[in-house]
Amino acid sequence: MMELLREMLSYPFIVRALTGGLLISLCASLLGVSLVLKRYSMIGDGLSHVSFGALSVAVAFGWAPLAVSIPVVAAAAVLLLRITGNGKIKSDAAIAMISAGSLAVGIIVTSLTTGMTTDVSSYMFGSILAMSREDVILSAVLSIIVLCLFVFCYNKLFAVTFDENFAKATGVNVELYNVLIAVLTAVTIVLGMRMMGAMLISSLIIFPALTSMRVFKSFSGVILSAGTVSVVCFFIGLVLSYVYSIPAGASVVVVNMGAFGIFSVIQAVRRR
């Protein structure tokens, strides 16, 4: 095993993929706990399609992908909150509408311009070769922000997640925290798409939270477990991807599915 790790870490692209992937997995899992509990779990899937559309446009016109996609996806996240918040459109319908529309725009722009290039394909399906040094640096900055949010604003996040009316009554700026979570989720998705792909990046948000909820019942317990599960599953998935030459995104998702199954068995045993 140690020999395998030394071999993997001898490649700079593997080091970048491992470092950036672990940081993004941690961010996605922490934000995912709040999103799943607030029943916004599918927002990750919707924003990933928005991100694909924005990245496709950026690649087609030769613009900087991150400079285009981050503000676009962040704006889409805030728009989703606004639409679902006024109660006129259900959250799942709003996500499906924006998701399908953005994906359609991305496909049309790609077809009319560059075609399915390597860059566009990597955004759709993911590639461990796509993680750049700048992506790793941005992932580190994002991780610091997310960790600070959960450490220093834990009580407010707890209140906003479980009871927004109570949070408002205690003076918490609920809208600010909802927007903050949505924007951080958007940035996490954009950074993670290069490696996981638009089709699978939302799994980093959903799986760790749902897996941890099978065993842990407290908010803090779920957060700590989700972060641990996500990081461990990503590491195992990346190793399997390297050993068997399979896509990293798919490998990580399959490992997360295995973790969900194990935690479900533990839950069943504990109930007996």
Segments from the language model and where they lie:
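Transmembrane alpha-helical segments in multi-pass inner-membrane proteins
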Residues: 194-195, 199-250
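Membrane-interface capping segments at transmembrane-helix boundaries
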Residues: 155-156, 265-272
